[in-house]
Swiss-Prot record:
Pathway(s) the chain acts in: Pyrimidine metabolism; UMP biosynthesis via de novo pathway; UMP from orotate: step 2/2
Protein name, per record: Orotidine 5'-phosphate decarboxylase
GO biological process: 'de novo' pyrimidine nucleobase biosynthetic process; 'de novo' UMP biosynthetic process
Subunit-structure text: Homodimer.
Active site: 63 (proton donor)
Species annotation: Streptococcus agalactiae serotype III (strain NEM316)
InterPro entries, per the entry: Aldolase_TIM (IPR013785), OMPdecase (IPR014732), OMPdecase_AS (IPR018089), OMPdecase_bac (IPR047596), OMPdeCOase_dom (IPR001754), RibuloseP-bd_barrel (IPR011060)
Length: 233
């Protein structure tokens, strides 16, 4: 069975911070990393080229949400960078998601963001005026993403089982908000799970940020999470 790599969220503001962080890892340890808005807006496409030159895979997490033509054109540009995975907001609708798929082509994995893991039931109903449960809203977006031809969704691990039931077992579920069991830090993630819990419910990819990037020994923290993520019981 192919070993799974946790996706490391490179939540840094510049290249210097990234290179300092990556120095904790052996060169032969090929990683799967997430580049978000802050780092991409700071460094631009050059950060993609640098990470790819090291042999690592990249999830470019920009959550595009615009009119279909703009998203199609933007995805066409991103496809040329050689990224391995990217995403759009499912709230942009089926036509926008179809346009994203057309622009990106068939190479990189394309996911739709459902509800952010920082979103609570109350926030969804009051701020977004969506009178559904979080899981029902997430599954609705997942079905629309599948209809649009996307590969899967970004959702909390708490919704994975229901998503798989309402789409299919091969529909990808990438889950942020993953925290090791010993983590007691409070942050903006509200719907979280441990790596083991995410594996048990059927998540296909997990994203881990601060428990690795803020660890005293990032490589050791990464290995422990990777071992828990791949553990067979």
């Amino acid at each position: 069975m192919l070993e799974k790599c946790p996706i490391i969220a490179l939540d840094f503001s510049d290249l210097a911070s990234v290179t300092t962080f990556l120095e904790h890892f052996p060169k032969e340890e090929l990683l799967f990393v997430k580049i978000g808005m802050e780092l991409y807006y700071s460094e631009g496409p050059s950060i993609i080229r640098y990470i790819k030159s090291l042999g690592h895979r990249i999830f470019l997490d920009l959550k595009l949400h615009d009119i279909p033509n703009t998203v199609r054109s933007s995805m066409s540009v991103l496809a040329k960078l050689g990224i391995d995975m990217t995403n759009v907001h499912a709230a942009g609708g089926v036509e926008m998601m179809k346009a994203a798929r057309e622009g990106l082509g068939e190479g990189p994995i394309l996911l739709a963001v459902t509800q952010l893991t920082s979103t609570s039931q109350e926030q969804m109903q009051v701020d977004q005026h969506i009178n559904l449960s979080v899981v029902d809203s997430v599954c609705h977006y997942a079905q629309k993403a599948q209809e649009a031809g996307l590969d899967g969704v970004v959702a909390s691990a708490q919704e994975v089982k229901q998503i798989k039931k309402q789409t299919n077992e091969h529909f990808i579920c990438l889950t942020p908000g993953i925290r090791p069991p010993q983590t007691n830090q409070l942050d903006d993630q509200k719907r979280t799970m441990t790596p083991e819990q995410a594996r048990i419910v059927g998540a296909d990819y997990i994203v881990v940020g601060r428990p690795i990037t803020k660890a005293e020994n990032p490589y050791q923290a990464y290995l422990e999470i990777k071992e828990e993520w791949n553990r067979i019981k």
